């Protein structure tokens, strides 16, 4: 299973993850790179409502379009919040060089572009990115070596089990040391 995503210039596979607020993987699906985020999100959430009954709200990035969000709300009954940069839909304005720029418009433009193209911490978006960063510590998940996508999914679940177990051991050891 392999594909090519022209927008991201990625050849191979994409990992679609459903994580909780702490970044622990609930479900993972590996699909070809030519599958869009919305299609991958639908594959990820197929037959999931009975498994995670307490799940009510999803935080997603801008790759998931309005039609996907409506599909989730209608099919699963969950609310969806698209987490984006504050300047995600602002591209700037065009103004002719030979005319002076009005000061009142300049002040309004400065308010809109505050943080434009600078690093901005986006709440909730970093949770999934942190989970992907955890995978880079495991050589097997750093690249896609496996022939079958199910093998990669199994290694992701194994890695998350190991990380969770390590956290539990640290929680048990800490009270004893005090």
Show the residue positions of the predicted features.
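Intrinsically disordered, low-complexity regions of eukaryotic proteins
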Residues: 7, 22, 131, 146, ...
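Polybasic low-complexity intrinsically disordered regions
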Residues: 1-86, 160, 175-178
């Amino acid at each position: 299973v392999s594909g090519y995503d022209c927008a991201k210039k990625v050849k191979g596979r994409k990992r679609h993850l459903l994580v909780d607020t702490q970044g622990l993987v609930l479900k993972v699906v590996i699909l070809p790179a030519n599958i869009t985020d919305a299609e991958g999100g639908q594959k990820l959430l197929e037959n999931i409502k009975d498994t995670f009954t307490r799940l009510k709200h999803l935080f997603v990035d801008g790759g998931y379009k309005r039609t996907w969000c409506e599909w989730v709300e209608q099919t699963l009954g969950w609310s969806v919040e698209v987490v984006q940069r504050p300047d995600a839909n602002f591209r700037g304005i065009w103004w002719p060089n030979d005319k002076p720029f009005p000061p009142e418009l300049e002040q309004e433009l400065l308010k809109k572009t505050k943080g434009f193209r600078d690093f901005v911490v986006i709440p909730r978006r970093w949770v999934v990115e942190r989970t992907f960063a955890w995978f880079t510590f495991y050589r097997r998940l750093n690249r896609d070596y496996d022939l079958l996508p199910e093998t990669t999914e199994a290694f992701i679940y194994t890695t998350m089990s190991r990380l969770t177990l390590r956290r539990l051991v640290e929680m048990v050891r800490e009270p004893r040391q005090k």
